[in-house]
Amino acid sequence: MDRIALMDAPDTDWSAWPAPAKLNLFLQITGRRADGYHLLQTVFRLLDWGDTVHLRVRSGGQIRRVGESLPGVAEDDDLVIRAARLLQSATGAQAGAEIRVDKRIPAGGGFGGGSSDAATVLVALNALWGLGLAADALAELGLQLGADVPVFVRGHNAWAEGVGEQLTPISLPEAAYLLVDPGVHVPTPALFRSQELTRDAAPAKIADFASGSLLDNAFEPVLRRREPAVEAVFQALSRVGTPRLTGSGSGCFVEFATRAAAEQALAQLPGGLRAWVAEGASHSPLLDARDARQV
């Protein structure tokens, strides 16, 4: 362990770090491992919109949350606190941190908010504490927090396999997205237990996605049957494009070639929906924030 990782760090002012949302442009389940985890294939698309994680380094080693970005979630259960403590434990870092999150990404919507926040803490504190861990090491730590964390650590759009941790960077065309949060949350484990879920899809290749033949999400038919609010959103979005589900839901989206087209579609939606527009990113703004501190 590099000695700098074992030293305390001086107190700093607050710094702001982006935690972008993501979309799953398709998602299929191809099998199940011996330990019960499902094997999947998906494409992660990073967005130019998301949460902001504020960090302040504190000497003495204490890690604490400031504010309550997730009402009802105990501090010890908060992914950002768990991420900071995991990094501290893994490296022997003696510095601490205060963490505050400006939440914009809906919790439990499949947009990756919790995972992205955790990844941002890992990447940012690695820089602020002067630890010097490589992306591979940070991604390995992130996997202990959740299968989606590594893609946010690496910061690139990716084809994903395994439980979502086997990542192959891919280039995606520019696009804008109309996003809708139906406002319902179904725990992912309950969806994986559903008898309606297709678990034996034929493994696909990146070329299949590139050809446009992969658009479906295995959780979509399950959620649309179970949740009237999700079905209502799909019906509303079908009037302006082809709606899709992200993650295990319940967030929905429609892809457009330009932001102007997405905003025009947004204006056509009925009132009462929580809807907004975001653009796809070629890479995570978190990487830009990290690199700016290294200059």
Curated annotation (Swiss-Prot):
Designated name of the protein: 4-diphosphocytidyl-2-C-methyl-D-erythritol kinase
HAMAP family registered for this protein in UniProt: IspE
Pfam family, one: GHMP_kinases_C
E.C. code: 2.7.1.148
Entries under InterPro entries matching the protein: GHMP_kinase_C_dom, GHMP_kinase_C_sf, GHMP_kinase_N_dom, IspE, Ribosomal_Su5_D2-typ_SF, Ribsml_uS5_D2-typ_fold_subgr
Chain's role: Catalyzes the phosphorylation of the position 2 hydroxy group of 4-diphosphocytidyl-2C-methyl-D-erythritol.
One MF annotation (Gene Ontology) recorded for this entry: 4-(cytidine 5'-diphospho)-2-C-methyl-D-erythritol kinase activity
Species whose genome carries this gene: Xanthomonas axonopodis pv. citri (strain 306)
Keywords: ATP-binding, Isoprene biosynthesis, Kinase, Nucleotide-binding, Transferase
Pathway: Isoprenoid biosynthesis; isopentenyl diphosphate biosynthesis via DXP pathway; isopentenyl diphosphate from 1-deoxy-D-xylulose 5-phosphate: step 3/6
Lineage start: Bacteria, Pseudomonadati, Pseudomonadota, Gammaproteobacteria, Lysobacterales
Enzyme class: transferase
